[in-house]
Amino acid sequence: MANRKIRWGIAPIGWRNDDIPEIGAENTLSHLLGDIVVARFEGTEAGGFFPEPQILNKELQLRNLKVAGKWFSSYIIRDGIASAAQAFDTHCQFLQAIGAEMAIVSEQTYSIQGLEANIFRDKPTFSKEEWKCLYEGLEELGAIAHSYGLTLAFHPHLGTGVQTKAEVDQLMAHTDPSLVSLLYDTGHAYVSDGAFLPLLDDYMDRIKHVHFKDVRSEVTDACRRDGLSFQQAFLKGMFTVPGDGCIDFTKVYRRLIRGGYDGWIVVEAEQDPNIAHPLEYALKARRYIDSYLLAGGEKQATI
């Protein structure tokens, strides 16, 4: 059931983590890109350790790889729209220079994803006035993205003010679809709400970028019970690559195909590379994709 319009990538976060720079620091750009080629993915997302465009483009061209996009931490509520817009403009200049398509935005005001706080209990919320500021700010950023030929994809994320299905509903209802699209991340949706399909079913027309992240349910239950932080939870192995956890990606992929999705699907799994060998897990994801998604096979759903 292959769709030639869909491009498959794998994120650098399995090799190195921008939030914990010491993890995987030995994995160079050449190492990462070489592993991506071996695992037969078409591209990646830019990490914080990626070099300037002139150097990066040469490395990508030599391997026939693309960069789909890059994460941007917005602080619209904390710093104001003008400040966020200025920083985002610089971000978009970089994306345009490397031939990327997606500007992945997460509002980080009050975020606890980098703190030692209970990720399952202590997520922030926004006031009515803060929500209004966020709507306006994201539309401003979306217009900037368009001016560079890019698409803004908002990333609901654990530990932020836009995490749950209800919060995504609120954001989607109050933003212009032509300016603010949605990044669909299976793992964040499942850990947040216990379900990964409702977002996909409700917002197929808004989804312009996809992360395939699997979840180890037993590890997640233990992390929830122990009140771990986001970083503690992913270092314990809460996330993994497709086919190694409890999510049935055949259901997700079929819905994407039926909905006419034609963007990137990026495998993303925060893990400790000293425990989960990056190339081993990239190959594991590749085998699952080939066997159960592109070949139209079946894998029994476990949730």
From Swiss-Prot:
The keyword Transmembrane helix does not apply. It is an enzyme of class 4 (lyase). Pathway: Polyol metabolism; myo-inositol degradation into acetyl-CoA; acetyl-CoA from myo-inositol: step 2/7. It catalyses: scyllo-inosose = 3D-3,5/4-trihydroxycyclohexane-1,2-dione + H2O. Keywords: Cobalt, Lyase, Manganese. GO terms for biological process: inositol catabolic process. Its cofactor is glutathione; Co(2+); Mn(2+). InterPro entries: IolE, IolE/MocC, IolE/XylAMocC-like, Xyl_isomerase-like_sf, Xyl_isomerase-like_TIM-brl. SUPFAM superfamilies: Xylose isomerase-like. The keyword Manganese applies. Its EC number is 4.2.1.44. Belongs to the IolE/MocC family. HAMAP family: IolE. This is Inosose dehydratase. The gene is iolE.
